[in-house]
Amino acid sequence: MRYVDFVDLRYEPKGTDVLCTFNVEPEGVSVEEAAGGVAAESSIGTWTELTTVKPYVEKLAARVFDIERNSIKIAYPIELFEPRNMPNILSSVSGNVFGLRTLKNLRLNDIHFPSELVRSFKGPKYGVAGIRRILRVYERPLVGTIIKPKLGLKTLDHSRVAYEAWVGGCDIVKDDENLSSQRFNPFENRVVKTLESRDRAEEETGARKVYMVNITAETNEMLKRAEFVLDHGGEYVMVDILTCGFSALQTLRQQDFDLVVHAHRAGHAAFTKNAKHGISMRVIAKIARIIGVDQLHVGTIVGKMFEARGEVAENCDALKKEMSGLRRVLPVASGGLHPGLVPALIKFFRKDFVIQAGGGIHGHRDGTIAGAKAMRQAVDATLKGVPLSEYAETYRELETALKMWGQQA
């Protein structure tokens, strides 16, 4: 089969097909030829016609069924893929095709998985509803922080910062993505001491608190760390899902630990930042949800990591829209957030998300407790419909934060 034979604009996708939307930028060929090349090389074809192709093999050919300028849609028969094997799926639809000579750029913008494939994975164990049950917080966004500085603190200082964030009002404290088990803060010591701080904060505040400890490591070591967290009364683990890999994530989820899985997307921009080439965050979010994370960083519309509103909305939709009965995943907004940005965040995300602030809490000139209080005060003010500037007349922590960083409506 020639590349153009994989283009069939009359084809109507079946309910069992895997559907991919690509943006193609051809190099020296037509869009149709480039599109056919993507479909061929990601299914049964190659650069020349073959004598070994049988009629039953031709039935497995991917089909380009829609072309609109440079946006193409390809349908893949489900028989091309092994259930419960995400590497197999991605090696086809996002593998060698990115290196084709006839393509200047290629971007996988969206993917639809049929129910049969979705249900072969475990999916989220807790999701939005389960997380809210654990924390007993139902009507507001969750407030979290990342221990700062991200690296360098010794274990006791790390646990002390966590304690201050919790008593100040944070629901969640998490490790940063590059803290694992360095000499200055070994994993097991950190888990024990920080969970002790959590227990003390819960006793003093009467509120539930959780610690997201980063267990990212070689897969077997990661499983050992998850068991250690569970054995010591932890309820959450954090995984850098792209650097440890989807297979490691799936192995973790298949253990069915009674642990909420928080997914950090460190490294995503290597795939997502170039709007013409790579893989969209929406695709990554769908894959993470299917495999089984419970909450995931999705970007934010403000702060140092801000992204286009439409893109962040698509990421949230990938986590929350109906998908073969999977639980909804809780979006996490993070990156340069502070109390003055809370109204804009809540207006966009509504209530079901995590406000994850590091410097915007620990950078408060009066310390971490004051920074956490200011963030909670900003949330309370916004939900009450009171302008932050007016609320700050009563709450000095918020007043100081607004003077330091300003505010955005």
Where do the language-model regions lie?
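Alpha-helix-loop-beta-strand connector modules within alpha/beta enzyme cores
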Residues: S42-W47, P186-V213, F246-G267, E311-R328, ...
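Extended, intrinsically disordered, low-complexity segments
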Residues: G367-A409
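Short Lys/Arg-enriched alpha/beta "domain-start" segment
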Residues: M1-V53
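Active-site-adjacent beta->alpha loops and helix N-cap segments on the catalytic face
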Residues: P124-R132, S180-A201, T219-M222, I241-F257, ...
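Phosphate-/polyanion-interacting regions in eukaryotic proteins
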Residues: S43-E49, V53-F121
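Active-site mouth loops of central-metabolism enzymes
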Residues: F22-V29, P141-S159, K209-E221, G267-I279
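Catalytic alpha/beta core domains of metabolic enzymes, predominantly
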Residues: K224-E227, H232, Y236-A357
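N-terminal small/glycine-rich loop or linker at the start of catalytic domains
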Residues: G123-L153, D199-R208, F257-F271
